[in-house]
Amino acid sequence: MVYKTQYHYTIGIIFMLCVGGLKGVGSQFLNVPGSVNEIKYGTQNALIYFPENRMGRSSLSVSHNDWYGDFSVISVGIASPIFGGQGLLRFKYGGFENLELRDEVPSDDPLSFYSAFGLDVAGGFQFQFNDIQTAVLLRMVQLRIHTHSSSGLSGNISMLKPINRDWKIGFSLAHFGFMDSYINEEPALPVSGNLLVEHRTVFQELQNTFSFSGGFIPSLDNYIFSANNAVLWRHLNLSLASHITKNVTHVSGSISFLIGMYQVQYGFQLGDNQLGISQVLELIVLLP
């Protein structure tokens, strides 16, 4: 039990702090998926928070993510038509509870207990103007580890424009904003500029959609490329994706099916970091 707790403690702290040192505080929590779409596409494209099958319909979503190292994430969101577009409000919470603080000497008695958590409150709006699909997302972030905390704002804006019947191209500016000082330094968010490409083909009842996003993250001296292919047949959707960064490659997949007013989604992600498999289960209720 002692060594299992120490393992979870190590994974949690490394996961939230050590990517780029303290300047990476917040970057990992922002990128932890809170929904199946985030595990499929990543978090660089704001448009993925506004799925097409919910345009014109209000919906309520609840999801649970078993992330690496028993880092548990819960997300609740509501989307609704507003001002000719679509509005979104979402809450995401993730963290560890009852972590044990220990010294370097092994012992059954911890020095103290504490928690590490992150809270992300996101609000956004999607609209279309002159064939340009635009999504804007603003996120308020609160992080706390032991007795230290940091809060800030993060924004995403994405635009996508058709260039012919099957292709769309656009760009996304992701995670720009600021964080309060954490301990003695001011953390930097993982700001990135990304190219977006989408190709869609339809054959009878089958629809195939290929999506690509790629960009550079200066604050982490890193890059991220994501490619996703999804096949839709009637009310069943299957997808497979690959996400590549400088140090880690992830593969993710999902299955989604719609039954009446209920949409059930399952997604998974695994990588060559050998931390296990992340799994997300999500229920979406389409409201009248």
Language-model-derived ranges and their functions:
Residues M1-V2, L17:
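Accessible peptide chain termini
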Residues V2-I11:
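Bacterial N-terminal signal peptides that target proteins for export
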Residues I11-V19:
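Bacterial N-terminal signal peptides
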Residues G20-P288:
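Subset of outer-membrane beta-barrel
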